């Protein structure tokens, strides 16, 4: 080590000091210029789309307002996908090495079919990245303070004012602005299949994962009502493929008493009953809802149903419902905080948006109940709080 140190300190017998300085300058310039040029070249749109796996998304981008618009300002690939700050840019470049690996070595996205299969995963990763830095790339062009709301569409102005007040991340509301949105339903439908396959109906308290017909007697052909998703029942008896159950819920005393709800005054549906099941209900208690001055009765109904689509823990149902919410309501805009609406308010809100989704009736019912059970006036009830709303 001493010899090496002495050699480094000793003047060169072969090279002049000027030559050594010149070499040092050249090396220094190279260390500065080459990475800069490399980053600049690999950040061009031409470089990005040179991989054939990027051609489909490039064609999508060409149809967007970021490619062609009235003002003639074009956002290139790097404008959206590479953070403007140096640490963020370097980090993104290092992460991009995985794209090269997946394309040329793992071959996981090297065909249109493979790319589509991973589109949701790739999109969610990019959304999370943009959410993490508060859409820094978007803000390099767009600024809340620079917006003239008078020149915006009234609805756009209203939404942007709310977003500006909360300093909301752009990606919360503008997913799919430049590329086709992935089909998020594959994720939550796979999750439901796994929930159904792993259903455990042991125990005295069960929860429904689907809309299930209920019967007045074991073996009946005609149903006497329906048990709705995410509803709790008590098992009274097991007989082969049949379960005798006890359903408890609230109904308006002056009404037809065919629908049971989770709480008095809140349209969180548990079950519908009719025929002999309805005729044999017991009234447990009554209460008056102050807001509407209406009397509600707590009823207890006994019925039979076939085994299947029941679980002994509500938490997996809520986890699935959360995927439903994020997989559908985040598609067109930023999903609002669930507690932004009360339980009854969520009915109209969801009805106004459901036409833009591909949810079936079971999914719609499950999602609505999840939202209602976590609403502003019921928050926490979805996680095991049994207290009744009076």
Curated annotation (Swiss-Prot):
Heme 1 binds at residues 48, 51-52. Residues 38-390 are periplasmic. Residues 1-16 are cytoplasmic. It is a single-pass type II membrane protein. GO terms for molecular function: electron transfer activity; heme binding; iron ion binding. GO terms for cellular component: Gram-negative-bacterium-type cell wall; plasma membrane. Heme 5 binds at residues 329, 332-333. The keyword Metal-binding applies. Part of the anaerobic respiratory chain of trimethylamine-N-oxide reductase TorA. Acts by transferring electrons from the membranous menaquinones to TorA. This transfer probably involves an electron transfer pathway from menaquinones to the N-terminal domain of TorC, then from the N-terminus to the C-terminus, and finally to TorA. TorC apocytochrome negatively autoregulates the torCAD operon probably by inhibiting the TorS kinase activity. Heme 2 binds at residues 77, 80-81. GO terms for biological process: anaerobic respiration. Its main location: membrane. Belongs to the TorC/TorY family. Binds 5 heme groups per subunit. This is Cytochrome c-type protein TorC. Keywords: Cell inner membrane, Cell membrane, Electron transport, Heme, Iron, Membrane, Metal-binding, Transmembrane, Transmembrane helix, Transport. Gene3D superfamilies: Di-heme elbow motif domain. Pfam families: Cytochrom_NNT. The chain crosses the membrane at residues 17-37. It comes from the Bacteria. Heme 3 binds at residues 138, 141-142. It is found in: Cell inner membrane.
